[in-house]
Amino acid sequence: MMDTTSERKSKSDFSYHIFLFPFQWDFKKEGKPLENMGFLERTLLDNMGALLDKSCWEREYFTVGHPIKFNEYIYFYDFVRGALYDSREKPTDILHQYNYLLSENPRYIIYIKNKKEPYDLKIERIQLNLYTTGVGILSFHLSNQSYSELKQILEINEFGRRIYPQFLAEGVFTEITKESFLADQLQIRIDENREFHDDFSYFNNIERVQENPSRLSAVIMNLLGNPFMTHKPLDKKNCVLISPILDDRMFVLCWFADRKLCSRLAVYNKDKETYRYEEDDDWYKLVFIEKSSPSCNSVTMKKQLLLEHTYDRWIGKKDSSLFGITRYSFIMLNDEQSTFVKDHLKTMYLQMVQLALVQRASVLRFSHEATRIASLETPGDTSGKVRELYEKYLQFVNKIYFREITAQEQGIDLYECIHQVLKLERDVKELDREIDELHQYASLCEDRRKNKQLHILTVLGALFIIPAFLTGFFGLSIFTADLGLTNKPLYLIMTIDIILIAVLSGFWVKAGKKWKIFLSIIILILIVFMLVLPFLGIDSTAPGVVP
């Protein structure tokens, strides 16, 4: 998983890049419409593992078998580790981790329009994390040993992270996008027999785009395999529907070693009491992933943004480091001799960022589910759906959403910075309000259902209360010969009378005021008739009466 010490000494990385693709997923069972499947059934982790190609993906269980892994493991609180590691010894129902099986020299190649040579980076690892909240993260871990200039690093980050066009221009479709943001072609070469690429030409046919506008890069879809789709399948096979949580950009983690740039940004002006980085365009472009000029023209706003998104605890000293954190990036710039910091990016800081992204993705996923349940035309088993969602939400709050994950001072600061830029505390509070309102809505639906059942019972009670009263009035003796109920004509008349009283009583419950008066008179007449009927002395031997 990690480079050994000897490997680090024999290699010199100018930069290290990790692209994170957060997405939401739904397992669709064969022969069962997705709309009819509950949230728990759609997010079972075991179903996902069964669909991954075993010849390409391998389950990864974390073990403390190397000093770097040990350093990473003890960095976090014990109660947090269940959301970070897939352990065989301590299995959890939170996370499953998979590694893509790579050859000796896999490559991540970025072709840029009007540029002769592509950027060719070594793939160290491709990892897939799947979480019980119905979200996942696909990550590409890339080593750069060939490109040292800032301009090259900016282009790698900008063009390497795009998974579909940001926009389509009328008539030329992806041409303008490729000049600014989108790679002309992305290619992953695993070995001679496995090579995935995408030139995004799919989006040059608007009729085809209309059929599936949410299509993701073919590079990602080919890595995941055939069971993974971005649109509902026509067949009935088991499959997984996925969609991006963010937009056309993957999240970027980048470590970059540049002594000159780092020293320049660390210059402190005692008169102004400011660092150079606070107004530096290069630092702005590196932090906000912009390859040419800063998109912010305002000098004051640019300075404010850099102050808000820069963590400078270790600036100006030996092994100087500068951190930039935004909603789409986590950047580490340091002296080129401080290569040990790269291992921090690949371990502790990666785990921090992944956890925060999972938290954000889960919040968005829960909000989507809450909206879906609330918008159902026929509530159906609303309380059951809300109960499933609430169960997952409690699991999320207790096992994934943490306000603090380490006792290390710098780790506490960085984690707080990540939470602030992602606005997680605000979003979790808003989600809590949404789910509370949904719970109230479900309770209202449940109360209505119970009231309806109670109303039915009331009607049934009204149907039988008068016959029960009459039966009690006459006592068991009405079935004896003394009252003549052995007389079949009399018995038949009384039965009809009881049925009429019961039916009219049912109508009386739902009737309006005027009808209730009319029905009350009719029912009263029938009751009086019922009371005097046994004493009328109808003869069973009368002509036409069969004894």
Regions inferred by a protein language model and the residue ranges of each:
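N-terminal extramembrane/targeting module of integral membrane proteins
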Residues: 250-375
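N-terminal pre-transmembrane cytosolic regions of membrane proteins
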Residues: 1-277, 546
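Membrane-associated alpha-helical segments
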Residues: 345-484
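Short, flexible coil/linker elements and helix-boundary hinge sites characteristic
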Residues: 31, 49, 187, 266, ...
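An acidic- and aromatic-residue-enriched active-site/binding cleft used to recognize and process polar
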Residues: 143-145, 336, 401
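Hydrophobic alpha-helical transmembrane segments and their immediately adjacent juxtamembrane loops
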Residues: 3, 7-12, 425-426, 430-547
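Intrinsic-disorder/low-complexity, polar/charged segments
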Residues: 146-163, 364, 368, 375-382, ...
